[in-house]
């Protein structure tokens, strides 16, 4: 078997019709975790429905509809392998809560794959001022996804025109540069997700294409999308920090009890550890930790784990709570926090008293802009105006925020995934923010400490 491959997470972004599902479906189908039985079942259904040509998007549609009906699909289905990595697709967009998932989920992405449609008019629509592509790319960058791959899709619809490809690359380079990415660090790959050109094998349709190159830690070159994914710089995982694990769900499982589920962001979690949930203020012992239905000796950053806890009911902890080690900088709720907020698209002006919903890690809570401390220059971070009355689209400011109910957040410099958020209002992301400092509440004293925690503490 050899050593297990390292795991990386990618998020696929781009305009609604760019072919994200087809491209992602293709990778999962060809290199992936979908077992032959499932594929045969899907193919049979596709044939019965007259979708006999069986396109990859169908795989994804099946997975997606099952996910939206609340059937949890084995997450292994969203995986595929490259020579070096086991890749998990964090979200296949088109999923209803994509932007929200970007915020709660991009913190998990090591790389974003931007799919751009090459068709006449399609490309232009995708990166126009109000195109989703711009918003997705900006979000990915602001939320710390520092690596990017650009796939120029649907090249077959342009008859594999080199001129069109060059035009798109030029535009896209300018576009991603404005967002913050350095085009020299980004591989550009012309593909057809539908026909499979340059996805896994080199296409014979574009003899003019000499391959992609990028210069990050080392120079890398290649031809296909799969090779570009394989050339992602290995992410550093913050194992040495104290544990922070935002809960995605809490299940009650017969015969086992209460099982919180979430992704380890920093630190490690193992059986026997005494954890504190904030802002709930509940402290208890972790009995065991598992991932993909297998018991783990410890959960590491990047792992999506379930762990069972003693003497805690499902009512006491919920999505948005954060678990941490009770003996090593345990998480706490906060009274307020200061953040650098960038207003992306708000139709009016934002002043003190504005109270939109914040999505920070898995928490979804209304927070009041209680004070606009100063307006700053987005590029330099220098103050340009103290205590502004209002801020509007395009502005950046330091804002004091007060959550409407207890929430657990951290400074971005201490725990990045818990220190960035999106501001949602009017069904769109109106702003994104990075937390500078947190006023933690010390109401923990009155919290609940279970018998199991006390017992474990004596060991």
Swiss-Prot record:
This protein promotes the GTP-dependent binding of aminoacyl-tRNA to the A-site of ribosomes during protein biosynthesis. The modification N6,N6,N6-trimethyllysine is found at residue 79. GO terms for molecular function: GTP binding; GTPase activity; translation elongation factor activity. Belongs to the TRAFAC class translation factor GTPase superfamily. Classic translation factor GTPase family. EF-Tu/EF-1A subfamily. GTP binds at residues 14-21, 91-95, 153-156. This is Elongation factor 1-alpha. It comes from the Eukaryota. The modification N,N,N-trimethylglycine is found at residue 2. Keywords: Cytoplasm, Elongation factor, GTP-binding, Methylation, Nucleotide-binding, Protein biosynthesis. The keyword Cytoplasm applies. The modification N6-methyllysine is found at residues 3, 30, 315, 389. One of its GO terms (cellular component) is cytoplasm. It is found in: Cytoplasm. PROSITE patterns: G_TR_1, G_TR_2. Gene3D superfamilies: P-loop containing nucleotide triphosphate hydrolases, Translation factors. The modification N6,N6-dimethyllysine is found at residues 3, 315. Residues 5-239 form the tr-type G domain. Residues 192-194 are annotated as: G5. InterPro entries: EFTu-like_2 (IPR004161), G_TR_CS (IPR031157), GTP-eEF1A_C (IPR054696), P-loop_NTPase (IPR027417), T_Tr_GTP-bd_dom (IPR000795), TRAFAC_GTPase_members (IPR050100), Transl_B-barrel_sf (IPR009000), Transl_elong_EF1A/Init_IF2_C (IPR009001). Residues 153-156 are annotated as: G4.
């Amino acid at each position: 078997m050899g050593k297990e491959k390292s795991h990386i997470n990618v998020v696929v972004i781009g305009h609604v019709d760019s072919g994200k599902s087809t491209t992602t479906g293709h990778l999962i189908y060809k290199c992936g975790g979908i077992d032959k039985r499932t594929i045969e079942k899907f193919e049979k259904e596709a044939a019965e429905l007259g979708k006999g040509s069986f396109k990859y998007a169908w795989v994804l549609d099946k997975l997606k509809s099952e996910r939206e009906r609340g059937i949890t699909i084995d997450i292994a289905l969203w995986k595929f392998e490259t020579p070096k990595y086991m890749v998990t697709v964090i979200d296949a967009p088109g999923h209803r809560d994509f932007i929200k998932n970007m915020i709660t989920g991009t913190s998990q992405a090591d790389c974003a794959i931007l799919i751009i449609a090459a068709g006449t008019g399609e490309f232009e629509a995708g990166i126009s001022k109000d195109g989703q592509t711009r918003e997705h790319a900006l979000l990915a960058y602001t939320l710390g996804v520092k690596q990017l791959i650009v796939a120029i899709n649907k090249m077959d619809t342009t008859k594999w025109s080199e001129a069109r490809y060059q035009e798109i690359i030029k535009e896209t380079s300018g576009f991603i540069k404005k967002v913050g990415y350095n085009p020299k660090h980004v591989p550009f790959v012309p593909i057809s997700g539908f026909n499979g050109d340059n996805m896994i094998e080199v296409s014979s349709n574009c003899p003019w294409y000499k391959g992609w190159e990028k210069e990050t830690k080392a120079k890398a070159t290649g031809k296909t999308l799969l090779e570009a994914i394989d050339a992602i710089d290995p992410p550093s995982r913050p194992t040495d920090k104290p544990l922070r694990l935002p809960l995605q769900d809490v299940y009650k499982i017969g015969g086992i009890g209460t099982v919180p589920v979430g992704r380890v962001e920093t630190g490690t979690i193992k059986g026997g550890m005494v954890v504190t949930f904030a802002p709930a203020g509940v402290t208890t012992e972790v009995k065991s930790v598992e991932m993909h239905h297998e018991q783990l000796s410890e959960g590491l950053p990047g792992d999506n784990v379930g762990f069972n806890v003693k003497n805690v009911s499902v009512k006491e902890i919920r999505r948005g709570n954060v678990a941490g080690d009770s003996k090593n900088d345990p998480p706490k709720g906060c009274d307020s926090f200061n953040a650098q907020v960038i207003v992306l698209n708000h139709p009016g002006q934002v002043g003190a008293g504005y109270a939109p919903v914040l999505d920070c890690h898995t928490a979804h809570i209304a927070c009041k802009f209680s004070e606009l401390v100063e307006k700053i220059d987005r590029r330099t971070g220098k103050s340009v105006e103290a205590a502004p009355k209002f801020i509007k689209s395009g502005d950046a400011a330091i804002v004091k925020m007060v959550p409407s109910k207890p929430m657990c957040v951290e400074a971005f410099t201490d725990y990045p995934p818990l220190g960035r958020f999106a501001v949602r209002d009017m069904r769109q992301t109106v702003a994104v923010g990075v937390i500078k400092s947190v006023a933690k509440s010390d109401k923990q004293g009155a919290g609940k400490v279970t018998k199991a925690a006390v017992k474990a503490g004596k060991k």
